Structure formats: structure tokens, C-alpha cells
Amino acid sequence: MLQRTLAKSISVTGVGLHSGERVALTLHPAPENSGISFRRTDLDGEMGEQIKLTPYLINDTRLSSTIVTDKGVRVGTIEHIMSALSAYGIDNALIELNAPEIPIMDGSSLPFIYLLQDAGVVDQKAQKRFLKILKPVEIKEAGKWVRFTPYDGFKVTLTIEFDHPAFNRSSPTFEIDFAGKSYIDEIARARTFGFMHEVEMMRAHNLGLGGNLNNAIVIDDTDVLNPEGLRYPDEFVRHKILDAIGDLYIVGHPIVGAFEGYKSGHAINNALLRAVLADETAYDRVEFADSDDLPDAFHELNIRNCG
């Protein structure tokens, strides 16, 4: 299977979830083996240089997965666009933006899916590399845990826990094996969510200024405030899976393995990536030149060429 990039550059504007400011974002094709990179067009000199994404650049995970370079350049809320790039198997792209955070759009990854569909996807000459999990790796902290286990495909199982009536109406656990299920159908539409009391607290600290009922599920003491309700009965846990897929794709390769988590979040997801990369016996970088050897979970990438 070959690496892929965008067929053409494409732009979109939106609002930053935390700044509330307008953000102009452009995705560009990139050369093979270059990976996913970001560039802040509003910064000059060294501050405006291209940033090659790695798990070691995620240095702020308080509210999202945020790049913070050693020069202090920030690119926040990257998990939704990374999740969409993962769904289309984009190995190489340059993402330019004129603000410190990716626009929140509607709170899901679906607008970025549409953006990729409009841009089109093209195969490149180099072979795609996958990160194959060879042995179990687990991180536990403060009542939360995440783990990778070997698996011939890509499967995600997550459980959330919130003592709240809105969450008690659906299962707290969702499992998706991408050998038989579609990311676009099952995951992409799930929106980020937050509690009204948290929104008020964040705004008191000049955060969450761009959040509203058009780009997030907002919950009061008893119920969902969005008049249209939920897009899936279990939209909350599905969004956590959307986030996790984006967080994991920061490693730069599709993962051949199973990911499980209980009360997972950006910090512990990133810690798991770092733990895997720190143990050379835990993973291998593999290629599938023969499509017959490709795990079923990735066959959809072979036919999803929207160019």
C-alpha cells in the first residue's frame, strides 16, 4: 500500500474554540516521507517555520492535544483534524493556519472529512508505513488506563464514566473494529461535549470563548441543551473514540493493533504513544506491498480515493 497526500490545496475558515477568534486554515499536499506538518502563517522568522508533528511535541493536554515547540509556538486542538486525516490514510500534508488553534468547526471531524473529500486524495510512490504493536503496553494513572495489544487490524474500545442523567441513557462503552465498520458512518459526526458549569468557569479564564450550541454538546445539571439532541444515542463515548484516533495518529502512521481505554484523555493517550516508542520490542514499522497481506481494517483505504 502506498503513501498518500492531498490532490490539491484547500482552505476553510472557522472559529477557535478557546480564543473565539476567526481562523483561516489551509491544507496542502506534501512530499512522500515528509509526514504531517503545521505552520503558523501569522508568525515571522523562526516562529513561523514548519513544525513536523511527533508525539514529543504534544506538551499541553489540559483541554486538547496542543503542540508546544521549544520556541513556544503553539498549535492547539489538533485531534479532530488528525482523526480525519487518519480516516483517509493521509501520510503527508502541510497544515497552515493564522492562529494558535485549529478551528473547532461543528465540534466533530465531519467538516474536515468533507474538506478532504473536496481536495481529493492521491497515492504517492513510497510505501505506506504502519506501526505494528508487538506486545501489550499499558499506562495507568489516577483511576484511568489505556493499553495497546497486538491485533491484526485496528480496533478501538473505550469506556467513559460520568455520574449524570444524560450519560446514563446509553452504554458507557463502545467498541469499533474497522475491519467491518466505517469511521465516517460510526465516528465522524460525534461532537465534543462539555458541562455548563465548566463552560462558565472556562470563560472566566478567557477559555472556551468560541464554544456554543453549534459546535459542542452542552449539558446542564440534568440534560442536553442542544435543541436537536444527539447525533448518536451514545455520541459522548463515540466522540472520545474520535479524539483517541486523532491522538494516536500523531505517531505518524496507522496503527496495527487494538487500543482500549477507561476514562481516557489526551494526556494519557500521548503517554501511551511515548511508552510504545520508548520500547523497541513493543512495535515494528511495517509495510504491505502486497494488498493481500493488508489487514482488513485498512482495505477501505485502498478504495477510498476521492480524487
Swiss-Prot record:
It comes from Neisseria meningitidis serogroup C / serotype 2a (strain ATCC 700532 / DSM 15464 / FAM18). The active site is at 266 (proton donor). GO terms for molecular function: metal ion binding; UDP-3-O-acyl-N-acetylglucosamine deacetylase activity. One of its GO terms (cellular component) is membrane. Catalyzes the hydrolysis of UDP-3-O-myristoyl-N-acetylglucosamine to form UDP-3-O-myristoylglucosamine and acetate, the committed step in lipid A biosynthesis. The keyword Metal-binding applies. It catalyses: a UDP-3-O-[(3R)-3-hydroxyacyl]-N-acetyl-alpha-D-glucosamine + H2O = a UDP-3-O-[(3R)-3-hydroxyacyl]-alpha-D-glucosamine + acetate. HAMAP family: LpxC. Its EC number is 3.5.1.108. Pathway: Glycolipid biosynthesis; lipid IV(A) biosynthesis; lipid IV(A) from (3R)-3-hydroxytetradecanoyl-[acyl-carrier-protein] and UDP-N-acetyl-alpha-D-glucosamine: step 2/6. Zn(2+) binds at residues 80, 239, 243. Keywords: Hydrolase, Lipid A biosynthesis, Lipid biosynthesis, Lipid metabolism, Metal-binding, Zinc. InterPro entries: Ribosomal_Su5_D2-typ_SF, UDP-acyl_GlcNac_deAcase, UDP-acyl_GlcNac_deAcase_C, UDP-acyl_N-AcGlcN_deAcase_N. GO terms for biological process: lipid A biosynthetic process. This is UDP-3-O-acyl-N-acetylglucosamine deacetylase. It comes from the Bacteria. Its cofactor is Zn(2+). NCBIfam families: lpxC. It is an enzyme of class 3 (hydrolase). Belongs to the LpxC family.
